[in-house]
């Protein structure tokens, strides 16, 4: 009896094993057939898709994506595959545009379907940046936020910030004359002071001011959270549900830290302004004060949430990019001293020796304007722009562009196209001929496309011009010397990230005369009274 049962059990087990093996085999065959059919479909579809580097099955171009300075590789690839190429990363399509005309055709002329942002799990969902103006998808909330910000940045009202920008520029130049090694830190402090005063009416007390340090921390967090390819959770969203204590999954802890910093950066300066703007009419000139004066208690909680997210974007969007531009300007003056001399000669001829340049002098200084424009072109602060996302399937120049594709404007490649800008690695302000129409072609690329173009362009332009013109009027930017008395000219070495800047820019700022330094000191002391 036992043997019969054993035989029966053995037979049943054998049958189940065979059935299980058969099921596994069937699943494997079906999976293989699905993969083969997908590849066949993709093979024929790719003939109408943009070209690009060879894609490996399943992972696509994941192993080919450069981790450092990706804009350089994309520009090289564009020479082989054309100005519109496609990369695939774990099933996610990425369109890289290295032609200004193509970028305008898609992101401006078809802006209704090219104005979304890619969904970033790490930065948007986990770290909390998803509701900020810079990462919002295009829609009613985005339009509301942009309307709030754009009014304070429009050309018709931007002049009211000139005194603020000029005063900060003068304090900065005096600081770096006295301590050239503080160039980056002093630039960060004084540009932040402009932005916090303009946005919230708040005057920064110094480098330890909590509103300043929190603002810097949130910018650093955003830059890290949005670093392309840095976070596996952006490609495998289910990873966001893994507990933070699991080894190797520290990103959830980092995201919580950044979310906390973001909330402080959003609400602390807003509450300060809300408590103080009514007591000081000057606060009505700031973005926050003007909104509170106009809307006041009529702001709903949802509108208030959107506003504080828009306001914190002003801080984040204007600080690191402007610092990058100033460091690039200083590097250019060190490497191309003949440009510095020519710009100083124009200032001397137009402004004279008895006063400091003003932002309102800009239209009388075409060569200085050209210097600023060439800085934007030579080292664009955001070399790959801020990615867009394609809302629906599209066709362009006979190519099929699929819904959901991440659209990356290769700003670096566009502004270093030798067919448009000969000798692109040379710093040549003369290439614009002093013509605003030629300079605008650069700024239209460097400051974004279509409905996602930077709303703070005119404000940033005023800040940069004030600093550049003041440096040129007051100082000679000169190299440091080594132990042998030889000049040390810094190389063009850039950081790698969403926002880039020159590394190790060491120099001295030598007053052109005792007279101009006295004028500077007197101006700073008068403004502080």
From Swiss-Prot:
Its cofactor is heme. Keywords: Glycoprotein, Heme, Iron, Membrane, Metal-binding, Monooxygenase, Oxidoreductase, Transmembrane, Transmembrane helix. Heme binds at residue 454. Its EC number is 1.-.-.-. One of its GO terms (molecular function) is heme binding. It is found in: Membrane. It is an enzyme of class 1 (oxidoreductase). The chain crosses the membrane at residues 24-44. InterPro entries: Cyt_P450, Cyt_P450_CS, Cyt_P450_E_grp-I, Cyt_P450_sf, Cytochrome_P450_fung. It holds the Pfam family p450. It is a single-pass membrane protein. Pathway: Secondary metabolite biosynthesis. SUPFAM superfamilies: Cytochrome P450. The keyword Transmembrane applies. Cytochrome P450 monooxygenase that is able to use trans-stilbene as a substrate for oxidation. This is Cytochrome P450 monooxygenase 45. It comes from Postia placenta (strain ATCC 44394 / Madison 698-R).
């Amino acid at each position: 009896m036992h043997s019969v049962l054993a035989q029966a059990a053995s037979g049943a087990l054998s049958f189940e094993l065979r059935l299980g093996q058969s099921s596994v085999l069937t699943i494997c065959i079906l999976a293989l057939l699905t993969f083969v059919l997908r590849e066949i479909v993709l093979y024929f579809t790719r003939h109408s898709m943009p070209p690009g580097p060879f894609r490996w099955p399943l992972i696509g171009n994941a192993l080919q994506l450069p981790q450092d300075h990706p804009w350089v590789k994309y520009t090289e690839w564009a020479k082989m595959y054309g100005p519109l190429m496609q990369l695939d990363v774990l099933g996610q399509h990425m369109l890289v545009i290295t032609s200004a005309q193509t970028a305008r055709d898609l992101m401006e002329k078809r802006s209704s379907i090219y104005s979304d942002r890619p969904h970033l799990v790490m930065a948007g969902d986990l770290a909390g940046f998803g509701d900020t103006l810079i990462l919002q998808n295009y829609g009613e909330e985005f339009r509301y936020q942009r309307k709030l910000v754009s009014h304070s940045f429009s050309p018709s009202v931007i002049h009211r910030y000139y005194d603020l920008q000029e005063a900060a520029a003068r304090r900065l130049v005096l600081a770096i004359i006295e301590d050239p090694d503080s160039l980056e830190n002093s630039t960060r402090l004084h540009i932040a002071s402009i932005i916090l005063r303009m946005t919230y009416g708040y005057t920064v007390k110094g480098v330890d001011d909590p509103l300043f340090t929190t603002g810097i921390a949130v910018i650093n967090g955003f830059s890290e959270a949005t670093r392309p390819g840095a976070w596996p959770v952006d490609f495998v969203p289910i990873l966001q549900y893994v507990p933070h204590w699991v080894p190797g999954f520290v990103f959830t802890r980092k995201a919580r830290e950044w979310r906390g910093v973001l909330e402080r950066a959003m609400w602390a300066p807003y509450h300060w302004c809300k408590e103080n703007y009514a007591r000081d009419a000057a606060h009505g000139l700031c973005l926050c004060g003007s909104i509170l004066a106009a809307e006041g208690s009529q702001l709903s909680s949802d509108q208030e949430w959107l506003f504080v997210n828009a306001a914190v974007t002003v801080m984040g969007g204007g600080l690191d990019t402007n610092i990058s531009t100033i460091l690039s300007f200083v590097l250019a003056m060190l490497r191309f001293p003949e440009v510095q001399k020519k710009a100083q000669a124009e200032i001397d001829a137009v402004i004279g020796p008895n006063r400091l340049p003003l932002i309102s002098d800009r239209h009388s200084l075409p060569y200085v304007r050209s210097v600023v424009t060439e800085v934007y072109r030579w080292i664009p602060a955001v070399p790959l722009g801020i990615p867009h996302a394609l809302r629906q399937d599209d066709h362009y120049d006979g190519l099929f562009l699929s819904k959901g594709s991440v659209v990356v404007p290769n700003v670096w490649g566009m502004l270093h196209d030798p067919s448009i800008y000969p000798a692109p690695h040379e710093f040549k302000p003369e290439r614009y001929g002093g013509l605003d129409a030629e300079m605008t072609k650069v700024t239209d690329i460097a400051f974004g496309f279509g409905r996602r173009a930077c709303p703070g362009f005119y404000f940033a332009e005023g800040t940069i011009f004030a600093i550049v013109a003041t440096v040129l009027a007051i100082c000679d930017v000169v190299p440091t010397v080594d132990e042998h008395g030889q000049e040390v000219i810094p190389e063009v070495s850039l950081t790698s990230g969403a926002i880039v800047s020159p590394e190790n820019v060491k120099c001295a700022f030598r007053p052109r005369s005792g007279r101009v330094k006295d004028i500077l000191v007197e101006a700073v002391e008068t403004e502080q009274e």
